[in-house]
UniProtKB/Swiss-Prot annotation:
Binds 1 [2Fe-2S] cluster. Its cofactor is [2Fe-2S] cluster. Keywords: 2Fe-2S, Endoplasmic reticulum, Iron, Iron-sulfur, Membrane, Metal-binding, Transmembrane, Transmembrane helix. Belongs to the CISD protein family. CISD2 subfamily. It is a single-pass membrane protein. This is CDGSH iron-sulfur domain protein. It is found in: Endoplasmic reticulum membrane. GO terms for biological process: intracellular iron ion homeostasis; mitochondrial transport; regulation of autophagy. Its main location: endoplasmic reticulum. Residues 1-35 are lumenal. InterPro entries: CISD1/2, FeS-contain_CDGSH-typ, FeS-contain_mitoNEET_N, MitoNEET_CISD. It comes from the Eukaryota.
Length: 133
C-alpha cells in the first residue's frame, strides 16, 4: 500500500506540477519542442480515458461495437428472407463469372470488388468465387 500512497501523494503531484502548462493562450505558442514533447503523455492518457468513457457510456458507441462483434456476415442483402439463396445456371455464364462471398457487394450475387476495402480494414483475405465455363 505504501507504493500506491507514494504515487498518489508525491510522485503524481510532482509530475503534474512540473508540466509546462502556460497561463495564457499566447503562452501555448511560445512553448519549445521539448515542452510539447513533455505534454504528450498526459494528453494521451486523458484522450484514452475519454475514449474509454465514450465507449462505456455512449449508446451509439455500444451499438456500433455490438454490430461489429455480432458475428453476422450479411448486414444488408435481402434481410427480409430467412435464407439468401441464388441459383445460377452454368449455361447462362458466358466465359466466367465472379460471385461475391463477403456480402459487401451492391450487385448481388456478382462481385463488384467491395471485398478489397473490407480486406484493407480487417486484414482479411476474402475474395470472390470465380466460375469458368
Amino acid at each position: 500500500m505504501e507504493p500506491i500512497s507514494h504515487l498518489v501523494k508525491s510522485s503524481l503531484p510532482n509530475y503534474l506540477s512540473s508540466l509546462p502548462v502556460p497561463d495564457s493562450i499566447g503562452g501555448w505558442f511560445k512553448l519549445s519542442f521539448k515542452d510539447w514533447l513533455a505534454l504528450i503523455p498526459p494528453t494521451v492518457v486523458v484522450a484514452g480515458l475519454g475514449y474509454t468513457a465514450y465507449l462505456a457510456y455512449c449508446p451509439a458507441a455500444r451499438a456500433s461495437c455490438a454490430a461489429k462483434n455480432s458475428g453476422r456476415c450479411n448486414n444488408h442483402i435481402r434481410k427480409n428472407e430467412p435464407k439468401v439463396v441464388d441459383m445460377i445456371d452454368v449455361e447462362d455464364i458466358a466465359e466466367k463469372a465472379a460471385f461475391c462471398r463477403c456480402w459487401k457487394t451492391k450487385n448481388w450475387p456478382y462481385c463488384d470488388g467491395s471485398h478489397g476495402e473490407h480486406n484493407k480494414q480487417t486484414g482479411d483475405n476474402v475474395g470472390p468465387i470465380v466460375i469458368k465455363k
